[in-house]
């Protein structure tokens, strides 16, 4: 039962985080951030937020620094928008799955070109 609730809270947090990043945060380091997923623990105490950033590694690190600096504000906004007893602690991670998928797709295209 709690797993279903954690999934619902994660989906709602994903929507709210996207809205917060787009409308509320004015930090130029956090301009090109996309929230790809949110995993909330069963006790709703922690949330792992997976993001992608448009840009190179330097911009990714700057974005992560900006997010960690704004973590308190983001958490308070989540607390205002989602009615929970305690707002989950946020941990930001880069979602490498999109880059990994693009790399595999490129390798498959190279194999197809070599086979022709």
UniProtKB/Swiss-Prot annotation:
Keywords: Cytoplasm, Ribosome biogenesis. PROSITE patterns: RBFA. One of its GO terms (molecular function) is ribosomal small subunit binding. SUPFAM superfamilies: Ribosome-binding factor A, RbfA (SSF89919). GO terms for biological process: maturation of SSU-rRNA. InterPro entries: KH_dom-like_a/b, RbfA, RbfA_dom_sf, Ribosome-bd_factorA_CS. Disulfide bonds: none annotated. One of its GO terms (cellular component) is cytosol. It is found in: Cytoplasm. Its main location: cytoplasm. Belongs to the RbfA family. One of several proteins that assist in the late maturation steps of the functional core of the 30S ribosomal subunit. Associates with free 30S ribosomal subunits (but not with 30S subunits that are part of 70S ribosomes or polysomes). Required for efficient processing of 16S rRNA. May interact with the 5'-terminal helix region of 16S rRNA. Monomer. Binds 30S ribosomal subunits, but not 50S ribosomal subunits or 70S ribosomes. This is Ribosome-binding factor A.
């Amino acid at each position: 039962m709690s797993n279903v609730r954690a999934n619902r809270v994660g989906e709602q947090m994903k929507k709210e985080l996207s809205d917060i990043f787009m409308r509320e945060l004015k930090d130029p380091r956090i301009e090109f951030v996309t929230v790809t997923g949110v995993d909330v623990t069963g006790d709703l105490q922690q949330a792992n937020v997976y993001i992608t950033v448009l840009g190179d590694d330097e911009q990714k690190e700057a974005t992560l620094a900006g997010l960690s600096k704004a973590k308190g504000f983001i958490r308070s906004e989540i607390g205002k928008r989602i009615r929970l007893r305690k707002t989950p602690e946020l941990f930001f991670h880069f979602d490498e799955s999109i880059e990994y998928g693009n790399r595999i797709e490129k390798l498959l295209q190279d194999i197809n070109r070599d086979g022709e």
